[in-house]
Amino acid sequence: MSQRKPDISEQSRDGILRRLFPACIDNAYQGSRIALWILGLMIAVRTTQSVAILVQGSSVAQSADGIPLDSYPAGAAQTIVALFALSAVNRLIISLICVLVLVWYRRAVPLMFLLLLVTYATGQLVGRVFPIVRVGQPPAVVMNLTLLGLTILGLVLSLWKRRSFAAIVSP
């Protein structure tokens, strides 16, 4: 009885799944080094954004996100700022986990990019169901789209298996 040989697409799909969900999480990273730099940049930006919200939540909500806090009663405006702060704490925790992965558990870098992508996608879904009233064209929209692009690029590059120089040079 002959067994069917898996085709190339099945092998690469299995390889991608193994890189996304590794059996062992250690520091043996196989993806592009550029993805590591992208993750580091994203950690820095997300951490800066989160700290800014925690320190000056009202100002950030109005200027960066275009939320007209002055048009709401004081209690409602305070609740909006508190929800922003809670979101910032969650982002800081994810950023801390990203730092741990970047330093000690690099095999999980693709999984972290996937987590960041899922976080963004679910945030967009929630934003469609419960839209936030904004004034003008807030810069946070452009920044978030930039971070989305970097997340997708980082995910692709982290899954892209790095070849050794000898493999590139030899025919």
Predicted regions and their residues:
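Short, Lys/Arg-rich, polar N-terminal cytosolic tail immediately upstream
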Residues: 1-28
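Juxtamembrane loop-transmembrane helix junctions in multi-pass integral membrane proteins
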Residues: 20-34, 75-85, 103-107, 134-138
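N-terminal signal-anchor transmembrane alpha helix
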Residues: 30-59
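Aromatic-anchored segments of alpha-helical transmembrane domains
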Residues: 45-48, 117-127
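Core segments of alpha-helical transmembrane spans in multipass integral membrane proteins
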Residues: 64-99
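Non-cytosolic membrane-interface motifs at loop->transmembrane helix junctions
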Residues: 66-67, 133-146
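Cytoplasmic juxtamembrane regions at transmembrane-helix boundaries
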Residues: 100-120
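Membrane-water interface at the C-terminal end of transmembrane alpha helices
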Residues: 149-169
